[in-house]
C-alpha cells in the first residue's frame, strides 16, 4: 500500500492525502470555490502545476489574487500569443518567450517582420484562444522524440533548444488544445485562466540568442495583469512615464545630449552641468564631517585588476587601452605595450590609498569617499539616456573598520542614506538584506558573523523607522565577496529604483594584503564596507528629472527664476529685481524681449523654469513683483524685499537650511 502524503497548510494544520493526489484534489478537499479559483500550488515555496501530484511538505494553494499568479498569467499569455501567431501566419517558427518585468515577449522567425498594425489582430485571436478554455496538459518526451516532432514541424529553433538541454534533464511539453511547446513550466490549469487583462505593446527586432552573428527574429512584447483595473493602472503609469521621460525633458530643458561618436557618455550642457554640480556639492557637504575625499587614477595597469579579480570575472564589462603609438607601430620594440584598464569601480584604488602607510586600530574607522568617474561596457542596445551609460560618476565610499565597528558603521551609513533620500523628497524606501550566494569567497564563519551583524542592523533600521521603512531579506542575492543592503526608493508614479548599497567585502582586503596593527600589535585584516547613496550620479539625476517631471525643487533647478517684463518701461525695474535675486545667490535670467507676456510665460514653462516673476508699470511703481509658479495658474503679488527673502529661503539646500535653523535655535 502506498504511503500517505503529509501536507502542512499555511494555518499550521497538517493533513494526510493518498499518494498520487494532485494539487487540484487538495484544493477540492477544502472547497469547490477554492478549486475553481486555484491556478497553481506551491510545495515548500516551489510553484508547481495544479495537476502535479503533491509531495510531503508545506503547501499553498495559489489563486489569481496571489502575487505569484502574475508570473503564471504572463507565462501563459506568452504561450497563447505564440499559438495565435501560428494560427494567423502558418509556417512562422516560435523560439523563446520568457516572462519579463511587467510582462512577456516571444521571438518569432517570420519571413516578413511584424508591424504595429498586426498587434490588434493577434490580440483578437488570443481572446478567441482564451475563450476556448483549453486545458494545459504536460507530457515528458524523450530527446529523440522531441527533435523528431519539432523537425517535422519545421521548428528548427526548437530542435536547437532541445539539443541545448543537458542530458538526463526532463523535456517537458505543454499542450493547450492541439498546440504545444517545449517549456519548463509551470502553467495554470487552462487558457481561460489567462483572462483578458492583457495588451500587446510593441514589436522589435532581436537576434537569436542575442548574438548579432545569428538570424534577426521578430519580437512581440506584451503585458498581462490579474484584472482590468491593474492593467489600466499600468497603462496609465506608462503614459505618465512617457511624459516624464528624462531624455525628452533633457532636450526641452537643454540639459544634455548623446551622440554617435560617444555612445553611452554624456555631453552635459550648461544647465545640466549646473544641476550635476549642485548634486555633487550637496553630497560633498553631507560627507565633509566624517569622510576624507580622495581621488584615485582612472587608468591603471591590468596587473592591479588581475590582483583585484576584476580582470578575471568582470573583464567583459571593462575598457582596455594602451598607447596609440604601441597600437599603430607594433614593430617598435621600444614602445610601451602595457595594457591599462579604465577603472570600472573605485574600490581597488581606495584599498591602495588605505595601504599607503601603516595604520593603527586607533585610526579606524577610516572613511574614504570619491566622486569617481568609472567606465563599464554596455551593449549599445542596452544604453538608455542617463539611466544606462558607459561612463558615469559614482558617489562611492569605502570604510575600513574593525569587526566590532561594523554594526555602528552600517547604521551610520543607513542614517545618511535615508536623510539624503528625504532631502530629495523620497518617502517610501525599502531596505533589503542580500545574503550569501552559492558561489562566494570567505569562510562560513566570516559570513555567519557578517550576516548576524547585518540582520541585527536591519531590525534596528525597522524599529527606528517606526514602520516608515519597509525591510526584507533576499536569500542568496549577496555579492560573492559579502552580504549587502540594497536601498530601493519609490517615485511619484510608483516605480521602484534601486539606488543605494552597503556591502561588506571579505575579498579585496585579502587580495591586496591590506591590514592594520591591532591592540596586540598584530597585523589584522580590516572589514571593508562599500557604500553608495545615489549610486550613479547621472542615473540619480535622471530619476530626479522623471520623479519631478522636470519641475525640479528650486534648490536643484539650474535656472531658478526668470524675470519677464510686460513693457519696456518696466525693464529698468526688472533689472533691479534680477540683480537683487542674484545678490541673494539665485540663478536668474531676464526676458525683456518685445513679446507678449503670455508667450514668454509659455516658452519658459516648456523649459521648466520653476519661478517666473512678471514686472509691469504697476509693479515698478509699487516696488512689488508678480510671482507665477511652474504648473500653476495662480499669481502671488508681494513686495520685492519679501519676495527675495522668501525665494532665497526656498532656494537654500535643505542641509544648509537645517544647520542655519539649528544655529538659530541654539542662539535662542
From Swiss-Prot:
It is an enzyme of class 6 (ligase). Binds 1 zinc ion per subunit. Keywords: Aminoacyl-tRNA synthetase, ATP-binding, Cytoplasm, Ligase, Metal-binding, Nucleotide-binding, Protein biosynthesis, RNA-binding, tRNA-binding, Zinc. GO terms for biological process: threonyl-tRNA aminoacylation. GO terms for cellular component: cytosol. It is found in: Cytoplasm. The keyword Metal-binding applies. It catalyses: tRNA(Thr) + L-threonine + ATP = L-threonyl-tRNA(Thr) + AMP + diphosphate + H(+). Residues 245-553 are annotated as: Catalytic. The keyword RNA-binding applies. It holds the Pfam family tRNA_SAD. Its EC number is 6.1.1.3. Residues 1-64 form the TGS domain. Its cofactor is Zn(2+). Zn(2+) binds at residues 347, 398, 530. HAMAP family: Thr_tRNA_synth. Catalyzes the attachment of threonine to tRNA(Thr) in a two-step reaction: L-threonine is first activated by ATP to form Thr-AMP and then transferred to the acceptor end of tRNA(Thr). Also edits incorrectly charged L-seryl-tRNA(Thr). This is Threonine--tRNA ligase. The lineage of its organism: Bacteria, Pseudomonadati, Pseudomonadota, Alphaproteobacteria, Hyphomicrobiales.
Amino acid at each position: 500500500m502506498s504511503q500517505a502524503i503529509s501536507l502542512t497548510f499555511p494555518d499550521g494544520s497538517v493533513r494526510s492525502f493518498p499518494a498520487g493526489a494532485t494539487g487540484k484534489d487538495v484544493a477540492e478537499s477544502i472547497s469547490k470555490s477554492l478549486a475553481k479559483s486555484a491556478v497553481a500550488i506551491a510545495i515548500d515555496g516551489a510553484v508547481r502545476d495544479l495537476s502535479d501530484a503533491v509531495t510531503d511538505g508545506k503547501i499553498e494553494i495559489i489563486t489569481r489574487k496571489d502575487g505569484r499568479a502574475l508570473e503564471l498569467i504572463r507565462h501563459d499569455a506568452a504561450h497563447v500569443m505564440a499559438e495565435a501567431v501560428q494560427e494567423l501566419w502558418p509556417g512562422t517558427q516560435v523560439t523563446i518567450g520568457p516572462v519579463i518585468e511587467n510582462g512577456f515577449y516571444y521571438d518569432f522567425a517570420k519571413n516578413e517582420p511584424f508591424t504595429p498594425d498586426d498587434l490588434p489582430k493577434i490580440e483578437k485571436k488570443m481572446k478567441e484562444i482564451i475563450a476556448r478554455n483549453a486545458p494545459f496538459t504536460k507530457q515528458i518526451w524523450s530527446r529523440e522524440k522531441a527533435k523528431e516532432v519539432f523537425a517535422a514541424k519545421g521548428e528548427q529553433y526548437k530542435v536547437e533548444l532541445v539539443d541545448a538541454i543537458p542530458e538526463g534533464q526532463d523535456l517537458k511539453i505543454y499542450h493547450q488544445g492541439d498546440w504545444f511547446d517545449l517549456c519548463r513550466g509551470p502553467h495554470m490549469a487552462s487558457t481561460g485562466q489567462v483572462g483578458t487583462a492583457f495588451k500587446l505593446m510593441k514589436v522589435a527586432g532581436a537576434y537569436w540568442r542575442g548574438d548579432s552573428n545569428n538570424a534577426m527574429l521578430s519580437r512581440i512584447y506584451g503585458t498581462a495583469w490579474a484584472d482590468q483595473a491593474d492593467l489600466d493602472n499600468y497603462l496609465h503609469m506608462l503614459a505618465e512615464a512617457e511624459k516624464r521621460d528624462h531624455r525628452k525633458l533633457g532636450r526641452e530643458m537643454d540639459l544634455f545630449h548623446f551622440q554617435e561618436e560617444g555612445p553611452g557618455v554624456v555631453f552635459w550642457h550648461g544647465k545640466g552641468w549646473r544641476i550635476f554640480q549642485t548634486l555633487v556639492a550637496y553630497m560633498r557637504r553631507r560627507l565633509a564631517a566624517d569622510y576624507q575625499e580622495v581621488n584615485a587614477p582612472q587608468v591603471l595597469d591590468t596587473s592591479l585588476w588581475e590582483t583585484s579579480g576584476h580582470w578575471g570575472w568582470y573583464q567583459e564589462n571593462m575598457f582596455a587601452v594602451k598607447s596609440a603609438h604601441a597600437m599603430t607601430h607594433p614593430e617598435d620594440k621600444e614602445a610601451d605595450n602595457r595594457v591599462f584598464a579604465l577603472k570600472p569601480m573605485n574600490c581597488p584604488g581606495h584599498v591602495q590609498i588605505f595601504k599607503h602607510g601603516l595604520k593603527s586600530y586607533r585610526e579606524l574607522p577610516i572613511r574614504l569617499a570619491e566622486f569617481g568617474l568609472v567606465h563599464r561596457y554596455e551593449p549599445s542596445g542596452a544604453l538608455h539616456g542617463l539611466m544606462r551609460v558607459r561612463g558615469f560618476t559614482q558617489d562611492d565610499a569605502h570604510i575600513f573598520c574593525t569587526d566590532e565597528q561594523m554594526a555602528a558603521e552600517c547604521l551610520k551609513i543607513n542614517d545618511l542614506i535615508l536623510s539624503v533620500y528625504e532631502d530629495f523628497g523620497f518617502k517610501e524606501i525599502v531596505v533589503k538584506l542580500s545574503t550569501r550566494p552559492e558561489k562566494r569567497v570567505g569562510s562560513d564563519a566570516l559570513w555567519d558573523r557578517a550576516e548576524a551583524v547585518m540582520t541585527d542592523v536591519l531590525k534596528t533600521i525597522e524599529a527606528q523607522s517606526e514602520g516608515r521603512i519597509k525591510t526584507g531579506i533576499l536569500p542568496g542575492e549577496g555579492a560573492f565577496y559579502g552580504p549587502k543592503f540594497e536601498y530601493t526608493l519609490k517615485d511619484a508614479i510608483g516605480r521602484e529604483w534601486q539606488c543605494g548599497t552597503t556591502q561588506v567585502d571579505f575579498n579585496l582586503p585579502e587580495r591586496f594584503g591590506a591590514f592594520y596593527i591591532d591592540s596586540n600589535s598584530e597585523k589584522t585584516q580590516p572589514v571593508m564596507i562599500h557604500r553608495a547613496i545615489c549610486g550613479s550620479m547621472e542615473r540619480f539625476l535622471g530619476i530626479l528629472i522623471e520623479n519631478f517631471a522636470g519641475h525640479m525643487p528650486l534648490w536643484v533647478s539650474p535656472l531658478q527664476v526668470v524675470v519677464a517684463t510686460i513693457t519696456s518701461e518696466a525693464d529698468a525695474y526688472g533689472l533691479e529685481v534680477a540683480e537683487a535675486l542674484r545678490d541673494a545667490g539665485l540663478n536668474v535670467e531676464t526676458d525683456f524681449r518685445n513679446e507678449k507676456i503670455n508667450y514668454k510665460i509659455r516658452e519658459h514653462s516648456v523649459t521648466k523654469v520653476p519661478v517666473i516673476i512678471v514686472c509691469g508699470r504697476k509693479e515698478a511703481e509699487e516696488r512689488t513683483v508678480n510671482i507665477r509658479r511652474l504648473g500653476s495658474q495662480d499669481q502671488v503679488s508681494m513686495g520685492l524685499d519679501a519676495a527675495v527673502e522668501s525665494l532665497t529661503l526656498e532656494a537654500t539646500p535643505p542641509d544648509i537650511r537645517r544647520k542655519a535653523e539649528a544655529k538659530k535655535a541654539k542662539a535662542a
